[in-house]
UniProtKB/Swiss-Prot annotation:
Belongs to the DyP-type peroxidase family. EfeB subfamily. Its main location: periplasm. This is Deferrochelatase. Coiled coil: none annotated. It catalyses: heme b + 2 H(+) = protoporphyrin IX + Fe(2+).
Length: 423
């Protein structure tokens, strides 16, 4: 049963209402103008860190293979565009904003104080790039009847349905498009979101948003050290090497031999899961049991019975699971068989801490994000293996969705989604 049906979500009427509101907002907006200023952006990082930047143009979007930055935000939107031409206007506008924000520059001045400011001002007079990446993905719903794109939908893209341990909230699921915004500092991420919303009042409406972070040592290592999640375990140890281009072609990127629509080449399937942790319950669980559930030493990250984090577990010599339990997380997620090689994926998860639930429990957990060339062979296959794992007692997926990360922008004459919309 599809998620929207269970929760009675009426998407078309909601979009019409939001589009009317967006049109009113657009009437009060003003064109962008750039002015030269030398004021520095605030922040605790050194100027060198603030000036770090990722290339915007290329075969693939940044933010997928990019070493994880410290701060992250996931924002899903409903698209309010009325037709395909309107959708093209949206994608061109997003491309322009991403290009400016990720490369940095002087904040625009507002020549007429009776009009709204052209920039939020939260970064000061100069918008430093701050290692910002903004990755645009499209959801299953963008390929409905509105824009005539159904024949071009990626073959494995689908609506997220419930797994046995899920407790999905309709307000935290799906979206026509998804932005993954990452940077060295949270204020840069927030500034980027506000800039994008300001420029698209008649084209986008926020559906849901979650902000995340990774442990400081991992962010400063630029991908060399594994983040630690809020259960206290290293998260992403078994990730494939993102610096290995040949391996990434096999694991992450859609290629010409997959019988996918031609426009998808260079893109990637993205699975997003908002996973709530029962941290109070976990913190009262004995260390030995925690390690048995994960199959790893909590301090070193090494597979049980081994010494180092990146040691490869030897399941063949432990067929009964006496060292690493048969239902441990690492053993189910990656059994290390010839068959499981096809289900590799690149994880890019972040922790979140939101406040307190209605029941008085800490609301914190994991923003799970992974990329793969085939959603069914990747995330869906792995998640089916994990159904019933011992860790389920401590975690509860509450939202997310499946998306397709668009191929990159070739140059200044190109725009995100151009190959899709020109078909």
């Amino acid at each position: 049963m599809q998620y929207e049906d269970e929760n009675g979500v009426n998407e078309p009427s909601r979009r019409r209402l939001l589009k009317g509101i967006g049109a009113l907002a657009l009437a009060g907006s003003c064109p962008v103008a750039h002015a030269q200023k030398t004021q520095s952006a605030p922040g605790t990082l050194s100027p060198d860190a603030r000036n770090e930047k990722q290339p915007f143009y290329g075969e693939h979007q940044a933010g997928i293979l990019t070493p994880q930055q410290a701060a992250m935000m996931l924002v899903a939107f409903d698209v309010l565009a009325s037709d395909k031409a309107d959708l093209e206007r949206l994608f061109r506008l997003l491309t322009q904003r991403f290009a400016f924000l990720t490369q940095g520059g002087a904040a625009p001045e507002t020549p007429n104080p009776r009009l709204p400011p052209l920039d939020s001002g939260i970064l000061g007079g100069y918008i430093a790039p701050d290692n910002l990446t903004i990755t645009l993905s499209v959801g299953h719903s963008l390929f409905d009847e509105r824009f005539g794109l159904a024949p071009q939908m990626p073959k494995k893209l689908q609506k997220m349905t419930r797994f046995p341990n899920d407790s999905l909230d309709a307000a935290l699921c799906h979206g026509d498009v998804l932005l993954q915004i990452c940077a060295n500092t949270q204020d840069t991420v927030i500034h980027a979101l506000r800039d994008i919303i300001k420029h698209t009042p008649d084209l986008l409406s926020v559906r849901w948003k979650r902000e995340g972070f990774i442990s400081d040592h991992a962010a400063r290592s630029k991908g060399k050290e594994t983040p630690i999640n809020l259960l206290g375990f290293k998260d992403g140890t078994a990730n494939p090497d993102s610096q290995n281009d040949k391996l990434m072609q096999k694991v992450v990127w859609v290629t010409a031999d997959q019988q996918e629509p031609a426009w998808t080449i260079g893109g990637s399937y993205q699975a997003v899961r908002l996973i709530q942790f029962r941290v109070e319950f976990w913190d009262r669980t004995p260390l030995k049991e925690q390690q048995t559930i994960f199959g790893r030493d909590k301090q070193t990250g090494a597979p049980l019975g081994m010494l180092h984090e990146h040691d490869v577990p030897d399941y063949a010599s432990d067929p009964e699971g006496k060292v690493i339990a048969l239902d441990s997380h690492i053993r189910l997620a990656n059994p290390r068989t010839a068959e499981s090689e096809s289900s590799l994926m690149l994880r890019r998860g972040y922790s979140y801490s939101l406040g307190v639930t209605n029941s008085g429990q800490l609301d914190m957990g994991l923003l799970f994000v992974c990329y793969q060339h085939d959603l069914e062979k990747g995330f869906l296959t792995v998640q089916k293996r994990l159904n019933g794992e011992a860790l389920e007692e401590y975690v509860k997926p509450i939202g997310g969705g499946y998306f397709f990360a668009l191929p990159g922008v070739k140059d200044a004459n190109d725009y995100l989604g151009s190959a899709l919309l020109r078909v």
